[in-house]
């Protein structure tokens, strides 16, 4: 996945026509399209193949099963031309390593989620999950744009591995804060696909991200 705009569009929709239209409209401002269960359960894995003809696709399946099942899931992801897959870290090193070993692209481990409930159960083990992601050879981690101070800490743990940061827009995160904190990519969904002009909104967000990336780092 080549970094141009730092924007990943979360296609959290169920209609194939809407997903393909959004992808075509925003592709000039998006580095990858993230698909989740709502779209795939509605349209099947064929939608991943179709989106992959427009741009890079990350399957946000938050894979969370035993090692053998994880291998089977990850194999299917890459058979359908995705470039990456998101997996949960709490399942343990052996199960995450199975995903990495089966992958023919990038594996991103969820270190900490962006919703409020994650602060209760997820955050206390998040640092350990980030360390594990490095140890098993994952391409990077997922860390919350809603808590940029956590992104800053995760950067010290994962070094030059990628950080994907969801929660920009509807959840309250800004495009600039996670980038300044060290995120490589921001993940945005509703703020773009619910906008009157998704292409214009995507352009605006990438401009904000670019300004943040160019600014001197905060200490």
Predicted stretch roles:
Residues 99, 176-219:
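C-terminal helical cap(s) of enzyme catalytic domains, especially alpha/beta-barrels
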Residues 138, 145-192:
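A C-terminal functional module that forms or caps the active site or interfaces directly
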Residues 62-65, 90-91, 112-115, 167-171, ...:
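Short, acidic/turn-prone active-site loops that include or flank metal/cofactor-
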Residues 41, 45-61, 101-112, 152-168, ...:
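Alpha-helix-loop-beta-strand connector modules within alpha/beta enzyme cores
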Residues 9, 33, 60, 85, ...:
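Conserved, mostly hydrophobic/aromatic
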Residues 1-59, 65-71, 79-82, 126, ...:
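Conserved N-terminal beta1-alpha1 strand-loop-helix module at the mouth
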Residues 13-16, 38-41, 90-93, 145-149, ...:
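Short beta->alpha connector loops
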Residues 2-7, 65-148, 160:
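Conserved anion-binding
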């Amino acid at each position: 996945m080549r970094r141009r705009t730092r924007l990943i569009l979360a296609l959290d929709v169920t209609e194939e026509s809407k997903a393909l239209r959004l992808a075509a409209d925003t592709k000039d401002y998006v580095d990858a399209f993230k698909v989740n269960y709502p779209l795939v359960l509605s349209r099947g894995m064929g939608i991943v193949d179709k989106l992959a003809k427009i741009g890079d696709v990350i399957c946000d399946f938050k894979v969370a099963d035993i090692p053998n099942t994880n291998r089977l899931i990850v194999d299917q992801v890459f058979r359908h031309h995705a470039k990456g897959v998101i997996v949960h870290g709490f399942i343990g090193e052996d199960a995450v390593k199975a995903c990495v070993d089966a992958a023919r692209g990038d594996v991103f481990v969820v270190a900490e989620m962006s919703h409020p409930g994650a602060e209760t159960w997820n955050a206390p083990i998040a640092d350990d999950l980030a360390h594990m992601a490095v140890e098993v050879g994952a391409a990077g981690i997922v860390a919350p744009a809603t808590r940029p101070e956590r992104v800053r800490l995760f950067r010290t743990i994962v070094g030059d591995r990628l950080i994907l940061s969801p929660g920009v827009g509807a959840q309250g995160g800004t495009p600039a804060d996670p980038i300044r904190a060290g995120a490589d990519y921001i993940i945005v969904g509703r703020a773009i696909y619910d906008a009157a002009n998704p292409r214009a909104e995507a352009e605006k967000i990438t401009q904000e991200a670019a300004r943040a990336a160019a600014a001197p780092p905060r200490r």
